């Protein structure tokens, strides 16, 4: 349900009226600084801290493992953000740990830069980053007893995500 963090009263209404079984507010990136740079509209109209608060409130209503947040994995590697693959991986895993500890499940979609299509090393770096992130992230989900609920996203029906396939293995 939705990609935007909605006010608490609407979250509660969706639950009370049994309109949705799980909810997803797309934070997109981890870190307040990156959020402000990459998501200026979301930052201006909702704000990073309010986005996190909406996700936490949704966990209070829907329960642990029924609240998701889509994340764009690899956008941190764009030159303007000045991050190495190791730094980007560490940041993303820190975010995964933090969100999972709150009962929120991040869903990582691979960033696909249009400008990099003629730069094979860009795609190799992204592929390696994405593989490392997903392997380590599976360990984090396991640590918190979280699995992707099949009512939200199932094995073989994901777009550019690996979580369901890893969980199903």
Protein language model regions, located:
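Short beta-strand/loop segments at the ligand-binding rim of alpha/beta enzyme cores
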Residues: 1-4, 62-68
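Core AdoMet radical
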Residues: 1-10, 15-54, 107
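Active-site beta-loop-alpha junctions enriched in small/polar residues
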Residues: 2-6, 28-30, 72-76, 111-114, ...
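Short, flexible active-site loops
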Residues: 35-41, 67-81
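Auxiliary Fe-S-binding modules of radical SAM enzymes
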Residues: 53-57, 61-66, 79-169
């Amino acid at each position: 349900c939705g990609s935007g963090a909605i006010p608490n009263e609407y979250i509660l209404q969706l639950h009370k009226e049994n309109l949705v079984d799980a909810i997803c507010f797309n934070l997109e990136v981890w870190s307040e600084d990156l959020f402000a740079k990459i998501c200026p509209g979301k930052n201006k109209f909702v704000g990073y801290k309010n986005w996190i608060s909406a996700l936490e409130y949704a966990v209070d209503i829907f329960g642990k493992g029924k609240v998701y947040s889509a994340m764009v994995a690899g956008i941190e590697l764009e030159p303007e953000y000045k991050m190495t693959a190791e730094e980007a991986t560490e940041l993303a895993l820190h975010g995964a740990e933090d969100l999972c500890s709150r009962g929120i499940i991040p869903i990582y979609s691979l960033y696909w830069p249009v400008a990099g299509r003629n730069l094979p090393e860009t795609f190799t770096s992204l592929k390696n980053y994405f593989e490392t992130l997903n392997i380590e992230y599976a360990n984090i989900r396991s640590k918190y007893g979280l699995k992707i609920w099949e009512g939200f996203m199932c094995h073989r029906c994901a777009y550019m995500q690996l979580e369901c396939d890893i969980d199903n293995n």
